[in-house]
Each structure stands twice: as structure tokens, then as C-alpha cells.
Amino acid sequence: PEALRVAGLPEALEARGVDVRDLGNLDGPRNPWTAPVEGYRHLDEVVAWNHALMEASYAELQAGRMPIMLGGDHCLGIGSITAVARWCREQGKTLRVLWLDAHSDFNTSDVTPSGNIHGMPVACLCGLGPDALTRLGGTSPAITPAQMHQIGIRSVDPEEKRLIKTHKVDVYDMRYIDENGMKRAVEAALAGIDENTHLHVSFDVDFLDPSIAPGVGLSLIHISE
């Protein structure tokens, strides 16, 4: 987050008419770099960070503002989307999530090859995972697979792919984009949106071509557009 501030992101947003309120950085436990326990790496730390982010995001939504979260591992999408889902239920709005990522992040502890929770956030949001994450906001699942629309996917583990098909997640992968173009993928993912739809965009930098954004943990070559 500090690098984004130094790079002038707040000023760039303000120049486009956005009223920016920088609330500073969230804080949480540091990464202990330990081995997986019962299929999960650093579960306690992930829960703590996501709980902090959920509370901060929900407070901003309650105040009538649009929270924008920058920086961090994409497992933090659990906290931000759980907050938005809760707010949408209370407001009677329909939530739609655009997940822009090179990975589907639909692993579970039963199929993950690594135990890294950054490969599991979408599954956790859909109710597949440890109670501490699937019930982070008190309701499980936080969202249904039908509310999740993924664009730019180009790395999926074999068993993860089976889970995605079983739960019918809407995925526009690189093959679809190569054949139909990014414009059509986005139009399809946004089809049916109306005035009562709340759109949440969750963006992992590895969605971009690594020649543009090389500084990611799991860089994959070439997203065409």
C-alpha cells in the first residue's frame, strides 16, 4: 500500500473525481512460515487478517462509502467479499462478483497440493473450507457459486477443475478469451445486471501479463488482452 501511495494513486483517483479517504493500513499477525496443519498453511493468521478486513470493509459500506482494498494476498478476498455479501443481504441487493485472476482459487484442503490458502478463497466463500473462514461473517456460504464470475483463468489444478465443474462456477478462461475476445467475456460476465445489482470486483495482479506486472508471487505468461 505504501508503494501505491508513493506512486500517486490517491491523486490519480482524485483527478478523476473520486473523493478519496485514505484510512491507512490494516495490521495483523506476521507470516510464521510454517508447514500445513490439517491441510492449511497459516490458518490462524489468515483468519485474523480476513476478519480485520471484513470489519473495516463492512464499516465503510454501512457509512455509505465504497471500500477499495489495495495490497496483500488474494486470500483476503474472503474478508472483503464476506463483508459485501452481508451488506447486500441487509440491503436486499443482488451481489455479483467479478474475480479477475490467473487462478480459479477453488481448491480445498482435500485437493490442494500445497495447503496454501491463497488457492482456496473462492471455495471458502462458497462454503467449502474450514468453519473459521466459511463462517467468517456468521453465514455460510457467504455467496453461491452462481454469484461468482471468473475472467482470465489460465492455471487450474486437476481436482480443482472437477470442483469448479461440479459447482458450476462461471469461468471465462484464456481459451474463451483467445477465441472470443476480452470484450465478449466481460459482456457475458455482466449480462443481466440491473439497478439492484451490487458489483464487486476482486483483482489479482497476476491476471495481467507478467511483462506489465512482474512483481507477483505466481506469475503466469500471457493474458492476451
Locate the predicted segments by residue.
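Conserved alpha-helical scaffold segments that buttress catalytic/binding sites
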Residues: P1-S224
